[in-house]
Amino acid sequence: MNISVFDMYRIGIGPSSSHTVGPMRAGRNFISLLRSQHLFPEVEGIKVKLMGSLAATGIGHATDSAVLLGLMGKSPSVIDVDSIPDWIKDIKDKNRLLLDSCKPISFTYSKDLTFEPSVLDSYHTNTLIISAFDAKGSELFSRKYYSVGGGFIETEEEAKLKQEPRALPATEEDKKALPYPFSTANELMKQCRKNGLSMEAVIRANEEVIRSHEVIDDTLDHIWSVMSMCIDRGLNAKGCLPGPLKVKRRANELYEKLLNSPLKVADDPLQVIDWINAYAFAVSEENAAGGRVVTAPTNGAAGVIPAVINYYRQFIPQANKEGIRTFLLVAGAIGALYKKNASISGAEDG
C-alpha cells in the first residue's frame, strides 16, 4: 500500500490527530457504512464506547465531541470550528443527535457514550466501538475502529487482514504502480542516484500517478495557506488556553517582544531561533485550543513544518513558492517512511 504525501498533511482540528481527528473520521465513516448498507433509515439509536487511551484522555482531547461531530457528518477538514461548542451543547441539552445533520435520534450523552480506560485492545490502545440500533433497541450494525495516529483510522476487519493503516476511504493510488517505488530512505536515495533525479522529482513523479502536476501544486499551496493562517491566528491570540490548568498563551507575548526589539536579526543572528519558536508556539497553541491545523504528520508535531517554512519565507532572500512546495513534498515523504516502518502514534510508541 502506497502512503501519499497528502495522507500525511491532513487538514483538521485540534488538539490531537489520533484522539480528535481520527475519532471524527471514524464517526463519519460509520455513517457512510450505514448508508451503503441501506440501514440509515432504520437507525433510531447510537451508542459509542471509547476504550484505552481514547477513554483515558478523551475529555481533554475532546474525543467524545469528535465522534459525535463525525456522526453528524462533519468533516475535520472543513468543519466550522466556531460552531462546535453550540452543536455539542445542543446534543447534551436536548438529548438528541442529528445523524448526518439530517436525522434526529434520541441520544443521552451520559448513557450512550461511555469511557472504559481500563479496557485495552491487543491491537491498539486507541480503540472505539460505534453501534446503531433500531426503534426496538435491536442492534443493526456495529463497527470497531482503531485510531492509529496522524488522523488515520483502521477498522477491526482491516486489522485482522493485517493491512497497513491508512485514512479511510482508500484512494486510487493503491491500485496503480509507482514509477519510483521506495519503502526506506536508502531505497529513496538509490532511486535518486539511479535515475539522476532529486528527491523532490522522485516524490512528485510518484504523486503524479494519481494527481496531475497542477493539482499537486494547488493542493500544496492550499496546505501551506492553512498552515500560514494558523500561524497568524496563534501569533495574535491572547489569554489562556482552554482547560482547568489555565495555561497562558506564549506565542503572542514572544511575537510582540520580537517586533519591538531594538535588535534585528542582522545584529543578533540567534534572534532567528526566537522567531521560529514563536511560529511553532503559535501553531501548537492553536492546536491546543481546538483550532484548524494541518497534521505534519500529527497534530502534536504540527508546529514544526509551518515554523520552518515561515522562517524560510521571512529570512531567506531567495525564498519562493516552488521552494515551499519542494519542502512540503520531501518532508511529507519522510513522514510517510516513519509511518510505514515505525509509528506516528504517541499512544502506541510515544
PLM segments and residue spans:
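Accessory "access/gating" subregions that flank catalytic or transport cores
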Residues: I210-D349
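N-terminal signal-anchor module of multipass membrane proteins
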Residues: N2-I13, A26-F30
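C-terminal regulatory domains involved in ligand/effector binding and gene-expression control
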Residues: P76-K264
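N-terminal glycine-rich anion-binding loops that anchor highly charged ligand groups
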Residues: M1-S4, H38-V43
